[in-house]
Curated annotation (Swiss-Prot):
GO terms for molecular function: metal ion binding. Pfam families: Metallothio_5 (PF02067). The gene is MtnA. Keywords: Cadmium, Copper, Metal-binding, Zinc. The keyword Metal-binding applies. InterPro entries: Metalthion_5 (IPR000966). All cysteine residues are arranged in C-X-C groups. These are thought to be the metal-binding sites in other metallothioneins. This protein binds cations of several transition elements. It is thought to be involved in detoxification processes. Induction: Strongly induced by cadmium, copper and mercury. It comes from Drosophila simulans. Belongs to the metallothionein superfamily. Type 5 family. The keyword 4Fe-4S does not apply. This is Metallothionein-1.
Length: 40
């Protein structure tokens, strides 16, 4: 299931419901978390 944080966003961990925490878990390759569409 795609990460709801944003396009191309990958999560370090996912909840059992398939959603991810768009905080510290949000990673977008070598880009900053903001690039994933996470909350500022």
């Amino acid at each position: 299931m795609p990460c709801p944080c944003g396009s191309g966003c990958k999560c370090a961990s996912q909840a059992t419901k398939g959603s991810c925490n768009c905080g510290s878990d949000c990673k977008c390759g070598g880009d900053k978390k903001s690039a994933c569409g996470c909350s500022k």
